[in-house]
């Protein structure tokens, strides 16, 4: 009877050890499984040179003569955790503020209608990621030749965090597209005030 208990105890220890090794292998594969790359693109929804349905309070007003909606990004980062805060370690830059201003400024009208531009491309450790953070420096809307600054929402200035699960595979490129909804993002303070703000509404599509 004592011998049977000893044998059973040994078996349980062996199984536990095997499970521990397997778990460690899986963890190692996820965290140290090589290097892939991530390309983040920018496209725009509902933005045309003919006009824009800007948000006014709870309604929309069609604004004609829209010639440009330019957005300057400070940086775009990704993180493995969906719960990571702005001050947490582990953010990886895909677009960073060291790049020239002209390379971080995009006209939403030029990336509408199925067009896109590349925000950034970088190598990343292979594995699972769950969050994209977008930080915007400034934005401008040009109507009938007159540029007007867009007041940026505080969230977009400190970091607009978008939850999106995606995987970077060893030796492969992953592409994410940020779909910037111009009509939902551009807001006018009051009808015909000419004072606009930007509260970004952004979706993410993986291709």
Task: Identify what each model region corresponds to.
Residues 22-25:
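C-terminal motif of bacterial Sec signal peptides marking the signal peptidase cleavage site
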């Amino acid at each position: 009877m004592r011998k049977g208990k000893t044998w059973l105890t040994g078996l349980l220890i062996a199984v536990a050890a095997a499970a521990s090794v397997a778990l460690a292998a899986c963890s190692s594969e996820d965290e140290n499984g090589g290097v892939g790359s991530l390309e983040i693109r920018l496209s725009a929804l509902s933005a045309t040179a003919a006009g824009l349905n800007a948000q006014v309070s709870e309604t929309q007003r069609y604004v004609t003569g829209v010639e440009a909606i330019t957005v300057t990004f400070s940086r775009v980062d990704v993180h493995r955790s969906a719960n990571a805060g702005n001050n947490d370690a582990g953010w990886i830059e895909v677009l960073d503020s060291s790049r020239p201003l002209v390379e971080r400024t995009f006209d939403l009208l030029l990336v509408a209608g199925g067009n896109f531009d590349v925000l950034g491309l970088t190598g990343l450790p292979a594995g699972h990621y769950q969050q994209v953070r977008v930080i915007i420096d400034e934005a401008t809307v040009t109507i009938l030749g007159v540029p007007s600054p867009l007041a940026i929402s505080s969230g977009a200035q400190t970091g607009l965090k978008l939850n999106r699960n995606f995987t970077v595979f060893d030796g492969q490129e992953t592409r994410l597209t940020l779909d910037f909804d111009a009509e939902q993002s551009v807001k006018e303070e009051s009808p015909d005030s000419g004072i606009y703000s930007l509260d970004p509404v952004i979706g993410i599509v993986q291709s």
